[in-house]
Amino acid sequence: MSEDMEVTNWGYTHISVKEFCYVWTIRNFSPCIDGIRRTITSPVFSLEANDEVTWCLIAHPNGVDEVSECYMSVFLELLSCRKSPVWAKYEFWITTSQGEKYQCMKSFNVHSFQKNQYRGFKKFILGDFLISHPRRFLPENKLTLCCKVSIVGSVFGMPGQNITPAIKDPRHLLTDDLGELWENSLFTDCCLLVAGHEFRAHKAILAARSPVFRAMFEHEMEERLGNPTEIHDLDPKVFKEMMGFIYTGKAPHLQSHSMATDVLTAADKYGLEGLKVLCEDALCRNLSVENAAQTLILADLHKREQLKTQALYFIALHASVVSETSEWKSMMETHPHLVG
């Protein structure tokens, strides 16, 4: 196409894709690999609680035929649907005792599923290999099999002339502007002293966002006006992350467990509920064998129920290795009620 050719017509097509992951724990798995061909079926599951499209997983610990008798076979079966066929991709893997993905196998194409039709892998993993590595794959004799399903739904096409150009969300403009006030210390009216570092800020913004700052400024002695307000027990990096959230509603540096932990403590102290939610989400995503016990204590201390639930689930899933850590043993001495 010539670069100077005028575009007179255009359009776009949107393909709806819904994804979800199902985790299936099979207890007392070892006796299933005994040379006898048997079928294990998971509970019925769906994308949403009332979804009319329902599925189940099928496992054959000793394969489905002579070709696959040394392997474990796994399949995804469509049990019910309002309209057939259902088009979907699928991906299977085993979750190890360390919480890692292993033997990830996926369909490279979108497949058509009719009711009661199943698809998957005859030769998923060697049965003897699973049995010979029980600490890694069968902690407490439990196999954790995961399946990610991507359902391809409706296809929508629309001509370009019917599309209203996207307008930038004005809330983003506001947070960008407020962030600039903070980053460049523009028109500030107070000074906060944190571990010897001075930070210029705006009383009105701090008071509007944090009830603790509001009370602090309301009761500030008149003779202290104009003098720095000292902030105790906060690291400057943690304080900057908290202040960035106060001005912009964002906290982009919560990837590390230690930072998210310290920022959660600060957010709780200064009554920043939105920041507590961001920290809780980051800590849920960063759960590991090493920090699970510490995270459970933290969740209980700051009354974060979602984080507490996720930590308990993670610990239950990896009990054999978590229970060997020094953090777990320490927690059992100081906070035994958390798992009682």
From Swiss-Prot:
Residues 188-255 form the BTB domain. It holds the Pfam family MATH_2. GO terms for biological process: protein catabolic process. Residues 19-149 form the MATH domain. Disulfide bonds: none annotated. SUPFAM superfamilies: POZ domain (SSF54695), TRAF domain-like (SSF49599). PANTHER family: SPECKLE-TYPE POZ PROTEIN. This is TD and POZ domain-containing protein 5.
